[in-house]
């Protein structure tokens, strides 16, 4: 059994299958406003803070007009949040089993997500797992988004653990880079993008799902 005293979870694409929802909402809005958007382009924005992504979209699609690009952003954001509020968001494989295992081992858990707190709270409550986490660190709590390590440093402070005794679980490149920057071991469970070899070598492991995290901790 590894000496892990606390686990930090990303949320989008790791706990919940939200990336697919974000993509579908954006593609639907892009088609409506004749904006050339596809899954390859969406992948470029995975793990990037909302404000940074919106600014980039305005620059990329400036020729379509500021108002049109803003409608594209607002409509896609609104549709995604409608789905979130409805509770129609699937948990990723292994989430419940891993949370139960960590609870049994008395290993505390924190969510550290670039999403906003209301969305995090809604999704966790709908899934019935809000009480499985001792704290939440959200976009409102940091000045600098991932890949800056600030969010994980704050999360670790909630746990009261050393970096060596903490484990970060991430699905996206920016999150992995943030954990590495914080000096915290990180397991990547890729969602829509596989890691580059150089990045993968800097992780504690790259695993297909959260089911395998239990085996990692036990061995």
PLM feature segments, named:
Residues 29-30, 49-64, 123, 155-156:
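Helix-loop "lid/cap" segments that line or gate small-molecule binding pockets
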Residues 28-33, 97-107:
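A short, Lys/Arg-enriched amphipathic alpha-helix followed by its capping loop at the start of a domain
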Residues 22-25, 46-50, 72-76, 80, ...:
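Hydrophobic/aromatic residues within well-ordered alpha-helical segments
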Residues 36, 58-97, 105:
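Metal-dependent phosphoesterase signature
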Residues 1-5, 100-103, 116-219:
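Asp-based, Mg2+/Mn2+-dependent phosphohydrolase catalytic module
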Residues 1-44:
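Active-site neighborhood of HAD-like aspartate-dependent phosphohydrolases
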Residues 32-35, 61-65, 105, 128-132, ...:
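Short helix-capping segments at alpha-helix termini
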């Amino acid at each position: 059994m590894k000496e892990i005293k606390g686990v930090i979870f990303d949320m989008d694409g790791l706990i919940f299958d939200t990336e697919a929802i974000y993509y579908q909402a954006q593609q639907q809005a892009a088609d409506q406003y004749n904006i050339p958007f596809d899954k390859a382009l969406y992948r470029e924005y995975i793990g990037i803070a909302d404000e940074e992504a919106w600014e980039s979209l305005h620059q990329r699609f400036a020729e379509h007009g500021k108002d049109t690009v803003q409608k594209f952003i607002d409509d896609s954001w609104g549709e995604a949040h409608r789905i979130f509020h409805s509770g129609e968001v699937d948990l990723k494989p292994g989430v419940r089993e891993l949370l139960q295992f960590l609870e049994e081992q008395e290993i505390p858990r924190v969510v550290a997500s670039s999403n906003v707190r209301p969305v995090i709270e809604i999704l966790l409550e709908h899934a019935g797992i809000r009480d499985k986490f001792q704290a939440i660190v959200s976009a409102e709590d940091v000045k600098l988004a991932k890949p800056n390590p600030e969010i994980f440093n704050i999360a670790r402070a909630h746990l009261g653990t050393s970096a060596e005794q903490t484990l970060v679980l991430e699905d996206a490149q920016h999150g992995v880079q943030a954990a590495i920057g914080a000096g915290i071991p990180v397991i990547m469970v890729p969602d829509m993008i596989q890691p580059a070899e150089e990045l993968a070598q800097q992780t504690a492991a790259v695993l297909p799902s959260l089911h395998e995290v239990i085996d990692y901790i036990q061995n």
